[in-house]
Amino acid sequence: MLTLMALTAIVGFLILKNKPGRWWFVAIAELALICRFIFVFVIYANGTEYSGTDGLLYHQIAKDIAIQLQSGTPLWKVRYEYTWYTVLTGIQYAIFGVNRYAASFVNAFFSVLSGYFLTGTALNLGFSVKKSRLIGIVYLFIPSMIVWTTDTRKESMIFFLIILIWYMTLRVIRQRDWSISRQCLYILTICLLLWLSTLLRIYMLYTFGGGLFICLLFCFLKTKRNMIFVFLSAVLITCCIVSFTTVRHNMRDYHALTMDRSTEGDENLDEEIDSILNTIMSKNIPNSINGFLTKPHLEEVPFIPDIAGNPFAITVVRIEMILWYICMIVSVFGIMYALIKWDPYLLGLLAFIVSYGLINALISENVADTYYRYRAAIVAPLLLFADYRPFFAKIKDLLMTASPDAKSGDNSIML
């Protein structure tokens, strides 16, 4: 724990280098990390081999992977189920020993790093230091961010990759004075992260691919920079390669999709994909989208398995849901401002949010806690839009610009 706390401080000072107030922000981040450590001990109060749902399942698989690695099985031949996150945890178990507490502490560490990179993204977008710090602090202390990122679940890594990819993308777009080699290194790293995100959650390739395509296309049309075109081409090539390799290979084993796995071959896979599409078309799309954005409703919160029977946790989640509804309303104005401003980066980020939400609304089971967990991935991107002031300031500027002409017209009539 002390090692992770030290690393948290070091990374915080590096990301927020030369930024005012970085000392107390890092202190708050350390507090957020400690809160997660405490929560780990709470959720494992009944033992690490009996607590949790998906987290317990991944823990059991990771132990088997550790045995494979220790017996000499090469990493690329390791047998795993559900998600590549179990392999990452298995590697940790193989090196340091089976310790679910340690695995959860690492997840908590990556969760806090996500808060740093989110704050850095806000600063690079030109937000004020105060606003950027507020976004990061809110993200660090949102209850769902604590709940879903401290167990041995894959959510912590997914949230981290989402924020890191968009952070690095913004850096490539904004830092025009970088050397070509440094820009290429960032682009190659982003492409690698796209592949890793696909291994963690199979459809992430397309949510990222769509968002980055919109972002980079409009950025290229606006700036005509050759490196942006190279970046766009690299993303498209990565999406094609990963689609025909990783996605195609793992589609049949993707546990969130209902498939007949007794058959093999491309023709049967095509039939299964057609079945999935038919299932999507049979859904009430408006109701599914509404469920993804708004569930769990306040009356459904007590029935979430992870917090059922815990009055304090139920109250906290209800408060969070009310704040989430407010955040969505406020974000509408931020989104309208982004559309008026026509900023390529914000448009791409918005495309990512929309595509991720739509995919999950259509393929996720209509269960409140499932929507609650999957929706947590778009909390960080949406926080970057959660400000009504720029929109109304823009409207005010437009009115002020038009008023002199109107006043001049009135005077001419009077004369």
Predicted segments with their positions:
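Transmembrane-helix motifs of polytopic, lipid-linked glycan transferases
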Residues: 11-17, 105-126, 329-333
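Short acidic/glycine- and proline-prone juxtamembrane loop motifs at membrane-interface regions
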Residues: 150-156
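Hydrophobic, aromatic-rich transmembrane alpha-helices
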Residues: 8-13, 297, 303-306, 310-343
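Extracytoplasmic catalytic/substrate-binding loops of multi-pass membrane glycan-assembly enzymes
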Residues: 46-61, 72-88, 97-98, 300, ...
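Membrane-interface helix-loop-helix junctions at transmembrane boundaries of multi-pass membrane enzymes
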Residues: 18-19, 124, 175-185, 223-227, ...
